Amino acid sequence: MANRRQPVQHRAQQRVYRQSQIRYAPGAGGESEISCCVKYSVFSFNVIFFLLGFGLLLFGVWAQIEKNTFVNMLSKASKLYLDPTWPLLIVGFLTFIIGFSGCVGSLRENTSFLTFYSTLLGLLLIAEFSAGVFAYACRDQLDNYIRNLLNDVVVGYRDDPDLQLLIDSMQETWMCCGINGADDWDRNTYFSIEAREVASPEAGGVPFSCCINSSKLEFKNYFCGHGVRLKPESHMAAHLAAQRVMAHTASIYTEGCLPKLQLWLNNNMLLVAVSMVIIAIIQVLGICFAQNLKSDILAQRAKWYYTH
């Protein structure tokens, strides 16, 4: 019985050995069908994406843990779309998966991973193209959606540290205040004029990032926006009231951030379009290289089976 098992085990070992040698065995002409240039180009290119995606993923998870969002996720489910770290997590995860499948597929010459890699890139390319067409066709609805989203961002300014940092950076960079103007901050519970009833120090004010030259100061004055939107008392003399309004108005940015965003997009439309085209070209090249490598691997396997 033992003698019968030995030939079977021997043949099984030989079969495993031969399969493991497919990618190393030269063809009938003594040369491999697999291009080392294509193989290691795909691998090197995707190592960058793998590391970039892994870094974004780690940073996003760390940011969520720092805010205890994972613990309170269900209670804050309605406001998850306002959390700026979620797009970071999604982009990081997709980049990580693409880079990982590309690295494994090219280095191990695994056709399944290369097929998954090409399919994922293709689906992503289709999604990007569809999103671009949809954004152009429904630009009016998209403008209203962005406006409503920014209004929600103003309302939730104090609810999320990352969201607060994002808004402050935007207002300081573009030298703007609110969505359409400084009065938009009246929608926020802390900055609304009605907050005077609870003696809020921020009532009728704006965030410090609305203050002119706030980003140039060595030490930020976080109280510079307090009460700048409060109307003068009725008993105050007209000229004093006018001076107070002018002084407060001169200390903050009065233009909204949405017009600034629209102006930036109009001035940099060519740059945005070129960036999108470059990203699409990189994806197409990734698909072509992966399919080329897959064809080489299949050709090498066919040649090896034919000669053995």
UniProtKB/Swiss-Prot annotation:
The gene is tsp-12. It holds the Pfam family Tetraspanin. One of its GO terms (molecular function) is protease binding. Functions redundantly with tsp-14 isoform a to regulate body size, embryonic and vulva development. Functions redundantly with tsp-14 (isoforms a and b) to regulate cell fate specification in the postembryonic mesodermal M lineage and male development. May regulate BMP-like Sma/Mab signaling by mediating protease sup-17 trafficking to the cell surface. The lineage of its organism: Eukaryota, Metazoa, Ecdysozoa, Nematoda, Chromadorea. The chain crosses the membrane at residues 42-62, 87-107, 113-133, 269-289. May interact with protease sup-17; the interaction promotes sup-17 cell membrane localization. Glycans are attached at residue 213. Disruption phenotype: Viable and fertile. In embryos, loss of protease sup-17 cell membrane localization. No effect on tsp-14 protein levels or subcellular localization. In a tsp-14 (jj95) mutant background, reduced RAD-SMAD reporter expression, a reporter system for the sma-6/daf-4 BMP-like pathway. In a tsp-14 (jj95) or tsp-14 (jj304) isoform a-specific mutant background, exhibits vulva morphogenesis defects resulting in vulvaless or protruding vulva phenotype, impaired egg-laying with severe maternal effect embryonic lethality and smaller body size. This is Tetraspanin-12. Belongs to the tetraspanin (TM4SF) family. GO terms for biological process: nematode male tail tip morphogenesis; positive regulation of egg-laying behavior; positive regulation of embryonic development; positive regulation of transforming growth factor beta receptor signaling pathway; positive regulation of vulval development; protein localization to plasma membrane; regulation of mesodermal cell fate specification. It comes from the Eukaryota. Keywords: Cell membrane, Cytoplasmic vesicle, Endosome, Glycoprotein, Golgi apparatus, Membrane, Transmembrane, Transmembrane helix. It is a multi-pass membrane protein. One of its GO terms (cellular component) is late endosome membrane. Expressed in the germline. Residues 1-41, 108-112, 290-308 are cytoplasmic. Residues 63-86, 134-268 are extracellular. It is found in: Cell membrane; Cytoplasmic vesicle membrane; Endosome membrane; Early endosome membrane.
